[in-house]
From Swiss-Prot:
The family this protein is said to belong to: Belongs to the RimP family.
Lineage summary: Bacteria, Bacillati, Bacillota, Bacilli, Bacillales
Organism field: Bacillus cytotoxicus (strain DSM 22905 / CIP 110041 / 391-98 / NVH 391-98)
HAMAP family, alphabetized: RimP
Cytoplasm is among the record's keywords: yes
Coiled-coil features, chain-numbered ranges: none
Stated role: Required for maturation of 30S ribosomal subunits.
UniProt protein name: Ribosome maturation factor RimP
Key words of the record: Cytoplasm, Ribosome biogenesis
Amino acid sequence: MDKKVTEVVEALAQPIVEELNLELVDVEYVKEGKDWFLRVFIDSETGVDIEECGAVSERLSEALDKEDPIPHLYFLDVSSPGAERPLKKEKDFEQAVGSQVAIKTYEPIDGEKMFEGKLLSYDGTTITLLLTIKTRKKEIQIPMDKVANARLAVTF
Protein backbone atom coordinates (compact mmCIF):
# COMPACT_ATOMS: atom_id res chain seq x y z
CA MET A 1 0.00 0.00 0.00
CA ASP A 2 1.32 3.43 -0.94
CA LYS A 3 1.45 5.31 2.39
CA LYS A 4 1.78 8.73 0.74
CA VAL A 5 -1.37 8.25 -1.34
CA THR A 6 -3.42 7.11 1.65
CA GLU A 7 -2.19 10.06 3.73
CA VAL A 8 -3.14 12.55 0.99
CA VAL A 9 -6.55 10.91 0.52
CA GLU A 10 -7.17 10.91 4.29
CA ALA A 11 -6.37 14.63 4.40
CA LEU A 12 -8.80 15.28 1.52
CA ALA A 13 -11.54 12.99 2.86
CA GLN A 14 -11.50 14.03 6.53
CA PRO A 15 -13.17 17.46 6.11
CA ILE A 16 -15.71 15.98 3.68
CA VAL A 17 -16.85 13.23 6.06
CA GLU A 18 -16.85 15.60 9.04
CA GLU A 19 -19.04 18.07 7.14
CA LEU A 20 -21.54 15.24 6.63
CA ASN A 21 -21.32 14.24 10.34
CA LEU A 22 -19.63 10.96 9.46
CA GLU A 23 -16.42 9.25 10.56
CA LEU A 24 -13.50 8.35 8.32
CA VAL A 25 -12.66 4.78 9.37
CA ASP A 26 -9.92 3.80 6.93
CA VAL A 27 -8.38 4.40 3.51
CA GLU A 28 -6.85 1.58 1.47
CA TYR A 29 -4.96 1.92 -1.80
CA VAL A 30 -4.32 -1.52 -3.27
CA LYS A 31 -3.58 -3.24 -6.55
CA GLU A 32 -5.70 -6.28 -7.36
CA GLY A 33 -4.69 -7.99 -10.56
CA LYS A 34 -3.98 -5.19 -13.01
CA ASP A 35 -6.37 -2.69 -11.41
CA TRP A 36 -5.80 -0.17 -8.61
CA PHE A 37 -8.51 0.44 -6.01
CA LEU A 38 -8.88 3.38 -3.66
CA ARG A 39 -11.22 2.25 -0.90
CA VAL A 40 -12.58 4.73 1.60
CA PHE A 41 -14.51 3.39 4.58
CA ILE A 42 -16.95 5.66 6.42
CA ASP A 43 -19.31 5.14 9.33
CA SER A 44 -21.48 6.86 11.93
CA GLU A 45 -23.09 5.87 15.21
CA THR A 46 -26.22 4.86 13.30
CA GLY A 47 -24.40 3.32 10.32
CA VAL A 48 -24.24 4.72 6.79
CA ASP A 49 -26.55 4.33 3.82
CA ILE A 50 -25.96 4.39 0.08
CA GLU A 51 -26.85 8.08 -0.19
CA GLU A 52 -24.15 9.03 2.33
CA CYS A 53 -21.60 6.84 0.54
CA GLY A 54 -22.61 8.48 -2.74
CA ALA A 55 -22.29 12.00 -1.30
CA VAL A 56 -18.80 11.29 0.04
CA SER A 57 -17.80 9.59 -3.23
CA GLU A 58 -18.97 12.55 -5.33
CA ARG A 59 -17.26 15.20 -3.18
CA LEU A 60 -14.08 13.18 -2.74
CA SER A 61 -13.91 12.44 -6.47
CA GLU A 62 -14.00 16.19 -7.17
CA ALA A 63 -11.26 16.84 -4.61
CA LEU A 64 -9.12 14.01 -6.02
CA ASP A 65 -9.54 15.33 -9.57
CA LYS A 66 -8.41 18.77 -8.41
CA GLU A 67 -5.48 17.56 -6.26
CA ASP A 68 -4.57 14.63 -8.58
CA PRO A 69 -2.41 12.63 -6.10
CA ILE A 70 -2.68 9.34 -8.01
CA PRO A 71 -0.73 9.16 -11.28
CA HIS A 72 -2.69 6.32 -12.93
CA LEU A 73 -6.24 5.02 -13.34
CA TYR A 74 -7.98 3.65 -10.26
CA PHE A 75 -11.44 2.75 -9.01
CA LEU A 76 -12.85 4.80 -6.12
CA ASP A 77 -15.03 2.81 -3.72
CA VAL A 78 -16.70 4.47 -0.72
CA SER A 79 -18.51 2.11 1.66
CA SER A 80 -19.15 1.18 5.27
CA PRO A 81 -16.48 -0.92 6.98
CA GLY A 82 -18.94 -3.77 7.50
CA ALA A 83 -19.39 -6.04 10.49
CA GLU A 84 -15.68 -6.89 10.69
CA ARG A 85 -14.67 -3.25 10.97
CA PRO A 86 -10.92 -2.59 11.22
CA LEU A 87 -9.60 -1.23 14.50
CA LYS A 88 -7.09 1.51 13.70
CA LYS A 89 -7.46 4.37 16.15
CA GLU A 90 -7.43 4.49 19.95
CA LYS A 91 -11.14 5.27 19.89
CA ASP A 92 -11.80 2.09 17.87
CA PHE A 93 -10.10 -0.09 20.49
CA GLU A 94 -11.82 1.71 23.37
CA GLN A 95 -15.24 1.19 21.76
CA ALA A 96 -14.46 -2.47 21.04
CA VAL A 97 -13.80 -3.42 24.69
CA GLY A 98 -16.15 -6.31 25.44
CA SER A 99 -16.37 -7.35 21.77
CA GLN A 100 -14.86 -10.27 19.87
CA VAL A 101 -11.79 -9.16 17.93
CA ALA A 102 -9.19 -10.70 15.64
CA ILE A 103 -5.59 -9.56 16.06
CA LYS A 104 -2.61 -10.32 13.82
CA THR A 105 0.87 -9.56 15.17
CA TYR A 106 4.14 -8.79 13.42
CA GLU A 107 5.95 -11.48 15.38
CA PRO A 108 4.86 -14.52 17.39
CA ILE A 109 3.61 -14.15 20.96
CA ASP A 110 3.53 -17.49 22.80
CA GLY A 111 4.25 -19.11 19.41
CA GLU A 112 1.24 -17.55 17.64
CA LYS A 113 0.69 -14.58 15.33
CA MET A 114 -3.13 -14.78 14.99
CA PHE A 115 -5.46 -14.30 17.94
CA GLU A 116 -9.23 -14.17 18.22
CA GLY A 117 -10.97 -13.49 21.49
CA LYS A 118 -12.86 -11.05 23.68
CA LEU A 119 -11.17 -7.67 24.09
CA LEU A 120 -11.04 -7.27 27.87
CA SER A 121 -9.12 -4.00 28.03
CA TYR A 122 -7.07 -1.46 26.13
CA ASP A 123 -4.82 1.06 27.88
CA GLY A 124 -3.22 2.79 24.90
CA THR A 125 -0.13 0.57 24.89
CA THR A 126 -1.47 -2.96 25.52
CA ILE A 127 -4.45 -5.04 24.45
CA THR A 128 -5.73 -7.70 26.86
CA LEU A 129 -7.64 -10.54 25.18
CA LEU A 130 -9.56 -13.45 26.66
CA LEU A 131 -8.90 -16.45 24.43
CA THR A 132 -10.95 -19.64 24.50
CA ILE A 133 -8.81 -22.66 23.69
CA LYS A 134 -11.05 -25.74 23.51
CA THR A 135 -12.70 -25.64 26.95
CA ARG A 136 -10.28 -23.43 28.84
CA LYS A 137 -9.90 -19.68 28.90
CA LYS A 138 -6.63 -17.78 28.84
CA GLU A 139 -5.81 -14.08 29.11
CA ILE A 140 -3.06 -12.72 26.89
CA GLN A 141 -1.54 -9.27 26.67
CA ILE A 142 -0.42 -7.93 23.31
CA PRO A 143 1.70 -4.76 23.08
CA MET A 144 0.29 -2.31 20.53
CA ASP A 145 3.65 -2.00 18.77
CA LYS A 146 3.37 -5.72 17.92
CA VAL A 147 -0.11 -5.38 16.31
CA ALA A 148 -0.01 -5.66 12.51
CA ASN A 149 -3.77 -5.35 12.15
CA ALA A 150 -6.90 -5.67 14.22
CA ARG A 151 -10.60 -5.93 13.43
CA LEU A 152 -13.91 -6.80 14.99
CA ALA A 153 -14.70 -10.51 14.61
CA VAL A 154 -18.15 -11.84 13.86
CA THR A 155 -19.03 -14.98 15.82
CA PHE A 156 -22.02 -17.25 15.37
